[in-house]
Amino acid sequence: MYTELKSYQQIIALLKEYGIRHCVLSAGSRNVPFVHSVEKDHFFKCYSVVDERSAGYFALGLSQELNEPVVISCTSSTATCNYWPAVAEAFYKGLPLIILTSDRDPAMLGQWEDQMIDQVGMYARHVKKSVNLPIINDAEDEYYCERLINEALLELDHHGKGPVHVNVPMRSYNSTFNVKRLPKVKRINRVDVQSDERIWADYAEQLCTSKKILVVCGQG
């Protein structure tokens, strides 16, 4: 059973589409919806590391050993700052980390709310991509959220590997876990000269069955 929070539903669904299964979790109040959901999904391999600084370095070693992307997830506010050293090292070592930071409603920023700092773009030049997801209220928000997650995941190995940051605001973190199926999501594939034969074969099949074909050549 999954969280009712749609942004986290989309994240989990797209992680599965991209085949990203290793998650290093530092559980806190605002990332419980993600933590509980992936722990109950047998697709994911979860590692519990309470201290965020230690979790970041554990994920670095895991990514380096497995040669795969690794997710790190924490609660909001200063907990996110503890990832900084590992994020910087991942950037300069070219290691693909997905940094998931839970956040509060942006309307509450600067209003003396507890556990809230400005987390948007907080890792600055030390990530390849940083996105701030919308709080989903309608179909347009769902589309935008899905697009941003895809953009972040595509950058993990675009022109070299490295970390990406996905910030996840929410109005309430008191999520129930009654959702049986994840939403259908669209994985966006980047095709270039280094793509494997399977991806090229899929696109060749699509072209052969299309009524109108336009091929545009240029530099990526």
Named regions from a protein language model:
Residues 1-220:
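N-terminal alpha/beta PP-like core and its mobile active-site loop of ThDP/TPP-dependent enzymes
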